[in-house]
Amino acid sequence: MQHTQSEKLHEEALQHIVGGVNSPSRSYKAVGGGSPVAMERGSGAYFWDVDGNKYIDYLAAYGPIITGHAHPHITKAIQTAAENGVLYGTPTKHEVTFAKMLKEAIPALDKVRFVNSGTEAVMTTIRVARAYTGRTKIIKFAGCYHGHSDLVLVAAGSGPSTLGTPDSAGVPKSIANEVITVPFNDIDSYKEALDKWGNDIAAVLVEPIVGNFGIVEPKSGFLEQVNELTHNAGALVIYDEVITAFRFMYGGAQDLLGVKPDLTALGKIIGGGLPIGAYGGRKEIMEQVAPLGPAYQAGTMAGNPASILSGIACLEVLKEKGTYEKLDRLGAMLEEGILAHAETHGIDITVNRLKGALTVYFTNEKVENYEQAENTDGDMFAAFFKLMLERGINLAPSKYEAWFITTAHTEEDIKDTLKAVDDSFKQLKQRM
């Protein structure tokens, strides 16, 4: 494939946009560098770049595009919003409709509030939890990304009983001192953290199914134990379902797993491709939020008609019969094919899959926590990523990210993808 126009565009972008990209995950730094491919058009499961090359897309904008690009029902909803005004600054009937849809889908939401992103949603759940409990510290799990607000850009300390350290320049040490980071799926470390800091903990922030160092499921009983221990300490459980909500079933991962949090943060899929976030939870906790309570949160763009109508349309599509069965079927087909080709060519991989999302790790070890994900072979992934890109398969440019199947993908797309996997593994083996 030729990428001449992408390369020229990236050179121009570097003159005007920091790093040439508007989110660092879009750069190719994690896969050895180079000019990221610039896309011009998306339709269904496919992308076309500025050089005219066609790709089968498994990035899905890092998850939100679960119905494929430019789904006609969602497109029509956005067009309707554009024709009637995209921003009012007033209440609308559509935001009530959408709030009811979310509550019906996720029973833990007694009350909801719309915001503009997953970052905002998580940031506000932490504020609300602090207001409700009168405490300040939070616990999070290593490797789990919860947006780019200061409080969650914190790396682990030297152990579960030590405070975190800033994971980004510009995050004050004083803020990192409010965060304890422990390994995911390690209940003993979680107990140790609570033994040390329990009386100061406002909430634990949990991805019930991890999506940010690949797809990693909780061990049996882990979430239940986290709930029990947290509540015994007088703290709240916050689920970050920005990636997981409506990804694995119609509703949240909490409903799939049968574990209920106190507060939930939502984003990505619920906007149908437009910017949105939402948070919600138990009535008595949510009543801490202004104008009812002292925890302030506001937003000019929050609940705007364009995002709300797009979100309603997206959920209407996802509610159709057979949606999640199809995603699971195609996911299984893709997983089985990848593993078979890896065995044929003698490539060490493991695949973590849940229904229509999976991660391919270049390792022979089952990945259950961030340390294991970190130890997978990044050089092998980088080579694989570039080989797949040349064969018309668009993946996220990071070994930590998931492949997302959409409702627009077909069995033929999976077969074509597996041909590319077979050829790429063959090339990798020859280089070893």
Curated annotation (Swiss-Prot):
Recorded metabolic or biological pathway in which this protein acts: Porphyrin-containing compound metabolism; protoporphyrin-IX biosynthesis; 5-aminolevulinate from L-glutamyl-tRNA(Glu): step 2/2
Principal location listed in the UniProt entry: cytoplasm
SUPFAM superfamilies in the cross-refs: PLP-dependent transferases (SSF53383)
Cellular localization per UniProt: Cytoplasm
Superkingdom of source: Bacteria
GO cellular component: cytoplasm
Single biological process term from Gene Ontology: protoporphyrinogen IX biosynthetic process
One example GO MF annotation: glutamate-1-semialdehyde 2,1-aminomutase activity
Catalyzed reactions: (S)-4-amino-5-oxopentanoate = 5-aminolevulinate
Annotated keywords: Cytoplasm, Isomerase, Porphyrin biosynthesis, Pyridoxal phosphate
Chain positions with N6-(pyridoxal phosphate)lysine modification: 268
InterPro entries associated with the record: 4pyrrol_synth_GluAld_NH2Trfase, Aminotrans_3, Aminotrans_3_PPA_site, PyrdxlP-dep_Trfase, PyrdxlP-dep_Trfase_major, PyrdxlP-dep_Trfase_small
Cofactors (names): pyridoxal 5'-phosphate
E.C. code: 5.4.3.8
PROSITE patterns reported for this sequence: AA_TRANSFER_CLASS_3
Pfam families for this protein: Aminotran_3
Class of enzymatic activity (EC top level): isomerase
Quaternary structure and partners: Homodimer.
Family (UniProt): Belongs to the class-III pyridoxal-phosphate-dependent aminotransferase family. HemL subfamily.
Name this protein carries in UniProt: Glutamate-1-semialdehyde 2,1-aminomutase 1
